[in-house]
Amino acid sequence: MKVAIANRQRRHPIGTPRLRKVAERILSALGYPDSELSVVITGDLGIRRVNREYLHKDRPTNVISFAMAEGEFGALNPAMLGDVIISADTAAREAEEGGVSFWSRLCFLLLHGILHITGYDHERSGEAEARRMEAKEREIFAILEREGLV
């Protein structure tokens, strides 16, 4: 399992080895032990650029995922799942609004992004799929909490 993490912001301290462990545990729980994943932590400005360029939405968001399997050459390397981009700025705001720690929110957004990459969808596939994704989020987040990763 290979998880590459790039922290491209400095405002919010993030332990990348610790975040890598969380990503590896999520992938293991989902049955992807031999996969590869790229995670980028950025600020609102960086994620806004990505959101505008690729999704045509000119605003920051919390997490954006790009699944390699959805691309034109997805079958070339099936082990490469894709990229998860998280805004630490938005995560920090959401953590404060939700009364949870920044770390907890960051890990939840990582989980949410990985679920999208592995085929879960809450936006385009209807209520049943949204409930299935939310149930999987609760299940795996509980594992992370039990194991002291969150």
Curated annotation (Swiss-Prot):
Single strand-specific metallo-endoribonuclease involved in late-stage 70S ribosome quality control and in maturation of the 3' terminus of the 16S rRNA. The gene is ybeY. Zn(2+) binds at residues 112, 116, 122. Binds 1 zinc ion. It is found in: Cytoplasm. InterPro entries: MetalPrtase_cat_dom_sf_prd, YbeY. Keywords: Cytoplasm, Endonuclease, Hydrolase, Metal-binding, Nuclease, Ribosome biogenesis, rRNA processing, Zinc. GO terms for biological process: rRNA processing. It comes from the Bacteria. One of its GO terms (molecular function) is zinc ion binding. Its EC number is 3.1.-.-. This is Endoribonuclease YbeY. Belongs to the endoribonuclease YbeY family. Its cofactor is Zn(2+). The lineage of its organism: Bacteria, Pseudomonadati, Thermodesulfobacteriota, Desulfuromonadia, Geobacterales. It comes from Geobacter metallireducens (strain ATCC 53774 / DSM 7210 / GS-15). GO terms for cellular component: cytoplasm. The keyword Zinc applies.
